[in-house]
A protein has these predicted regions:
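Conserved PLP phosphate-binding loop immediately N-terminal to the Schiff-base lysine helix
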Residues: 1-22
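Conserved small-domain helix->loop->beta segment predominantly found in fold-type I
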Residues: 68-75, 92-145, 164-176
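Alpha-helical structural signal in soluble globular domains
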Residues: 4, 8, 110, 114-118, ...
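PLP-dependent enzyme catalytic core of the Aspartate aminotransferase-like
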Residues: 147, 153-206
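Active-site C-terminal subdomain of aminotransferase-like
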Residues: 22-26, 32-103, 109
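Active-site core of PLP-dependent enzymes with the aminotransferase class I/II
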Residues: 1-4, 32, 187-192
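Short loop segments at secondary-structure junctions
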Residues: 18, 33-38, 145-148
């Protein structure tokens, strides 16, 4: 999804980078703080890395935050994970978010078509519970599998498909689990989705 946090008048936002930004487990998080809060004396978990960098090493007793989102930093970031993150962001910059979003809508739309076609052919064993409107979703689709969902997940995994599994909600009587899948526009292709459809179809037949 394309974000416009400032334009949306968002106060604060935070996110991880390990999955969709390709930075790996344990990588740095990101944070957004609207500029109207930059000079406010808000309660915060303050760290020395958020102190005014021109006076940081004076070791004064009072915290003097930087006038930006940097003021919410606690300590210096880990160098090795930052290097991986930088390389990942360079790839996104080269590809361009407009192009990635356009491909994402087409690729995820194609996956939804494939899933609905296969589900109808097998008596609707699963339902896509992700919003149908492309503007209301990213590239991930979640399937609510009515029966034998874990077995279906295991079969897909054995066939080289990287998806993940969420156990049924224990607070309800519904015993349907969820399989989540995401055709990532940076490196997945329409052929990948087509081949996945064949694997899923064969898995349901077996």
């Amino acid at each position: 999804l394309k974000l416009d946090l400032h334009g949306w008048n968002t106060d604060f936002a935070c996110w991880c980078s390990y999955k969709y930004l390709n930075s790996g487990p344990g990588s740095v998080a990101g944070a957004f703080v609207h500029e109207r809060h930059h000079r406010e004396k808000l309660p915060r978990f303050a760290g020395w890395w958020g102190h005014d960098k021109n006076e940081r090493f004076l070791m004064e007793p009072e915290f003097k935050p930087m006038a930006s989102a940097e003021a919410w930093q606690l300590s210096n970031a880990p160098v090795f994970s930052m290097a991986v993150h930088r390389a990942a962001l360079d790839l996104f910059d080269r590809a361009g978010m407009d192009a990635l979003r356009a491909k994402s809508e087409e690729l995820t739309g194609y996956l939804a078509f494939v899933l609905k076609t296969i589900s109808a052919a097998h008596g609707d064993p699963f339902t896509i519970i992700t919003p149908d409107d492309p503007a209301q979703r990213g590239c991930q689709l979640s399937l609510l599998v009515r029966e034998n969902g874990r077995a279906l997940f295991d079969t897909l995994t054995r066939n080289g498909v990287v998806v993940d599994w969420r156990e049924p909600d224990p607070s309800t009587s519904l015993r349907a689990g969820v399989i989540r899948m995401a055709p990532v526009p940076l490196y997945n292709s329409f052929e990948d989705v087509f081949r996945f459809g064949g694997i899923l179809d064969n898995a349901l037949r077996s």
